[in-house]
Amino acid sequence: MPAEGANPFAQFAQALQWDRARWIWLLCAVLALDLVLGLGDSVAAILRYDRSAIAAGGWWRLLTAHIVHLDLHHLLLNELGLVLVWALFADDYDPLEWCIIVLSGALAISSGLWWLSPRVSWYVGLSGVLHTIMGAGCARHLAVRAWDRWILIGCLAAKLAYEQLGGHEPALVVVDAHLYGAISGFVVGALLSWRVAIIRQRSRAAGPSPSLRR
């Protein structure tokens, strides 16, 4: 990680993640989202978060709702968001950790909608999971004392507060999903960072130790 006193612009350039393998994963994710949209409305109806359908046993919707989109415009907005957050946070965790973060975030969002937002009858889209990624990234940047940690946390907190205080169009955006996603991502990211820190402390005397990414 660059020193905190280094040139902020140089640090930001280094913070962007351009590892080829990770961008191949991103491309695969984008293509998968495109494929789901191309399957049509009948498939989307089977995959989306639908409160009555989940109550009837459609538990898979708790996960699949996050890969379904309303239309091409909705999909492209979320794919753009995915590219941006991936550029900032891709290298903060290894592939297994990212799987844990994304899956736990998807479940946390759907569970939050189920238990805490009963008025939400249906939901689709990746935006909640994007906030999970942002929350996890903020947790890791905070753990390693990255120069941009307070900027990222402040921007995310301000966005969530703005949405929760009514600065959105409630008919179009389920902002509770953003809140649940960000909280779950931050918590899981903090736990993963704490785990690595503990392992590093315990193995310090034994030789090379795991390091927090960034």
State the predicted function of each range.
Residues 1-20, 163-214:
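C-terminal transmembrane module of polytopic alpha-helical membrane proteins
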Residues 16-19, 51-57, 144:
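Helix-boundary and loop/linker segments of multi-pass membrane transporters
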Residues 35, 87, 110-115, 137-138, ...:
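Alpha-helical transmembrane segments of multipass membrane proteins
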